[in-house]
A protein has these predicted regions:
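Extracellular/periplasmic, surface-exposed regions of secreted and cell-surface proteins
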Residues: 1-114
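Short acidic-hydrophobic sequence patches enriched in Asp/Glu that either
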Residues: 44, 56, 197, 213, ...
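Transmembrane beta-strands of outer-membrane beta-barrel proteins
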Residues: 10-12, 76-78, 178, 184, ...
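Outer-membrane beta-barrel transmembrane strands
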Residues: 1-6, 16, 55-57, 168-184, ...
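Glycine- and acidic
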Residues: 43-47, 161-164, 173-175, 250
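Conserved small-residue
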Residues: 50, 67-169, 201, 208-248
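Glycine-rich phosphate/pyrophosphate-binding loops
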Residues: 184-204
């Protein structure tokens, strides 16, 4: 890195980091054949923490700070810093991917990258959610009655046969802070504001509020539930080009 001072008022530093961590601790979920199971009252998927994998973290760090005002009684200092971070999984045991909830550890991808079901939209003829079909699960989808073909393209109404895709990373493109320190004699006032730009998050609270559950259960719901499908729109047919509403609510 490089650091310095200009005009006895402005301080700056620029740095680059590239850190590789080995034998990281990951939670590995065992398959059903190893005794893993699901209980509605308590999720008892058999897992084990293992020292596996190599991860790279690299990026730039920039820091600026300077005295805007500097006198016997008054001092006003402003500061700014920014950091970029690129995270990548470099090595996994046997090169095998590891699913972890809505994310997946995979060589060449970030450990914070989302790996989710690809939602296509709402079928305006039925009100059901449609997902891109995993070609390997077509027979299973057909047997379960979840296969839907619309204008020559096959979809599924169940995530069990849906195709998962990379959907961006939870890491911001850049993050940092702004700071202000104002001093008058022996009194001082400091303010620190943080920021982050980019990155995707999964709003689990919103997802929960959009789940109506059973009719007998009492729970708080989000007002967007009122936008749910409410019947076949006028003029809609099975072959309408706009049969799938990508912004619809099932």
């Amino acid at each position: 890195g490089v650091e310095g001072t200009l005009f006895a008022r402005l301080n700056f530093s620029v740095g680059y980091f590239d850190k590789r961590s080995k034998d990281l601790l990951f939670e590995v979920r065992f398959p059903l054949s190893a005794g893993s199971y699901f209980d509605s009252d308590a999720i008892q998927n058999l897992t084990q923490y293992q020292n596996i994998g190599t991860i790279s973290n690299r990026g730039f760090e920039i820091m600026l700070s300077g005295d805007v005002v500097r006198s016997k009684d008054w001092t006003w200092n402003l500061s700014f810093d920014a950091t970029t971070l690129k995270n990548k999984v470099l090595k996994l045991p046997k090169g095998e991917d590891i699913l972890h909830g809505q994310q997946k550890y995979s060589e060449g991808h970030s450990a914070y990258e989302w790996f989710t079901y690809h939602f296509v939209g709402v079928d305006q003829m039925t009100g059901k959610s449609l997902y891109e079909l995993d070609p390997k699960q077509e027979a299973a989808a057909q047997a379960a009655g979840d296969l839907v073909e619309i204008n020559g393209t096959k979809y599924t109404t169940s995530t069990s046969q849906a195709l998962r895709k990379w959907a961006g990373t939870a890491l911001p493109s850049v993050y940092g802070s702004f700071g202000s320190n104002l001093r008058w004699k022996d009194l001082s006032l400091s303010v620190l504001m943080t920021y982050s730009l980019g990155g995707k998050t999964m709003d689990s609270s919103y997802r929960s509020l959009m789940s109506t559950g059973s009719a007998s259960s009492a729970a708080a719901l989000h007002k967007d539930v009122l936008n749910s499908w409410n019947g076949v729109p006028e003029g809609m047919t099975a072959t309408s080009p706009n049969r799938i509403d990508p912004n619809g609510t099932p």
